[in-house]
């Protein structure tokens, strides 16, 4: 990161750390001195397996769609079109991926994702079911990405997401 201060709509945020990189951007944990947030900086790096148009508008549109469906997600704070940045609520805690690798699965997580699917599939949608995109907090599993895509059975939770979750839990068993 060439700088440790990023702005969204003229407000400065200090970068605390990189949270992760996805196909659409880099997510940073930032603070304004009062609270912590996630700031996503859209990137334009090539992705062999996915084609995205206007990534910022796509994320904002997907956020509205998923919110309307009642998917538990972090609140959208602000978006800055010129700098292609999104500021959203920070859901503290480890991701499902981290917890699976630590040998701390919760069977309620699968049921919560399946409940999300009962809303998503009839709307013709999938989300990115990769376990790094979910954070449990106070009994609720949050989908911390804003991405959704057209439903395709090979990429739904039962055919893609659940096997990935199971494989990550198995990695823990093999490493132990």
Report residues per predicted region.
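The N-lobe alphaC helix and its flanking beta3-alphaC-beta4 segment of protein kinase-like domains
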Residues: 51-69
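Protein kinase-like catalytic core scaffold
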Residues: 37, 72, 86, 142-144
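Conserved hydrophobic core/spine positions of the Hanks-type protein kinase catalytic domain
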Residues: 115-119
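Hydrophobic residue at the +6 position relative to the catalytic HRD Asp in the kinase catalytic loop
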Residues: 129-134
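C-lobe/activation-segment region of protein kinase-like
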Residues: 121-126, 137-176
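ATP-binding glycine-rich loop module of kinase domains
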Residues: 15-57
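Conserved structural core of kinase catalytic domains
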Residues: 71-110
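Juxta-kinase regulatory segment immediately upstream of eukaryotic protein kinase catalytic domains
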Residues: 1-16
């Amino acid at each position: 990161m060439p700088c440790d201060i990023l702005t969204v709509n003229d407000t400065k945020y200090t970068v605390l750390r990189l949270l992760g990189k996805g196909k659409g951007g880099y997510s940073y944990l930032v603070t304004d001195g009062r609270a912590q947030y996630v700031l996503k900086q859209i990137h334009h790096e090539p992705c062999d397996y996915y084609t995205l148009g206007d990534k910022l508008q796509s994320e904002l549109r997907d956020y509205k769609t998923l919110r309307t469906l009642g998917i538990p997600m972090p609140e959208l704070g602000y978006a800055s079109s010129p700098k292609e940045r999104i500021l959203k609520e920070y859901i503290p805690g480890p991701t499902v991926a981290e917890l699976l690798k630590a040998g701390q699965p919760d069977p309620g997580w699968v049921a919560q994702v399946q409940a999300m699917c009962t809303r998503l599939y009839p709307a013709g949608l999938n989300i990115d079911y990769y376990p790094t995109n979910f954070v449990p907090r106070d009994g609720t599993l949050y989908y911390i990405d804003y991405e959704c895509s057209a439903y395709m059975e090979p990429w739904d939770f039962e055919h893609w997401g659940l096997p990935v979750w199971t494989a990550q839990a198995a990695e823990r068993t093999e490493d132990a």
